[in-house]
Amino acid sequence: IKKEIEIGNSFLINLTAKTRINSNYTIGEIFNGANAKYTCYLKDEFVCFSPETFVKIKDGKIYSYPMKGTINASIPDAKNILLQNQKEISEHATMVDLIRNDLSRVSKNVKVTKYRYYEEIVTQEGNLGQVSSEIMGELAVNYNENIGDTLFDLLPAGSISGAPKQKTVNIIAAAENEDRGYYTGIAGYYDGKNLDSTVLIRYLQNDGYYRSGGGITCNSDALNEYQEMIDKVYVPLF
């Protein structure tokens, strides 16, 4: 991964891995008890409790909320540490630029309406601090006639792939050496006018493997990246 970055084939690579966990609950029971922004369950396959929006469509506008930057919120001054970390600043800027370009393919007058705002996610192990941005574009009047094309044109989500997207996807496939399946795909609800969708992260498979990951850049430290991946392994049952 670092070699591909060093020779300029990618600026940001979202690398993921599996962690074996033990639970007294089935994934269906976890779904019924999970407390998360988005929950998704596919029988005999997976349960997902994602904090990340993929895109929203409302009143003819499309919004994306790339999430890049994670920290254990119990660390003293965690918010400022995360917001001032140069690696995280660079990673987030790369992702915002990628998503802005993605939205420009399906909408007009694209702009960043919120940049690097901090939120906390509650887990049994303690809170996680995460940083997101909001990007907005204006859709064509007849956008609902091509909603499928719009979504597929934005896939895969930038936050779980990297930049440049297609080359980075190829690097990820070679490094992970395993199909992600449903993991890091999207799910959502569309009523014919408005859409709300999520990226399938914070993901537990029926075989007991939990999948998590993070963004790798030229400034990444292996131990810090490993710790971030472990911090993201949690089941939000309270």
Regions found by a protein language model. Give the residues of each.
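Extended alpha-helical targeting/anchoring segments
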Residues: 1-238
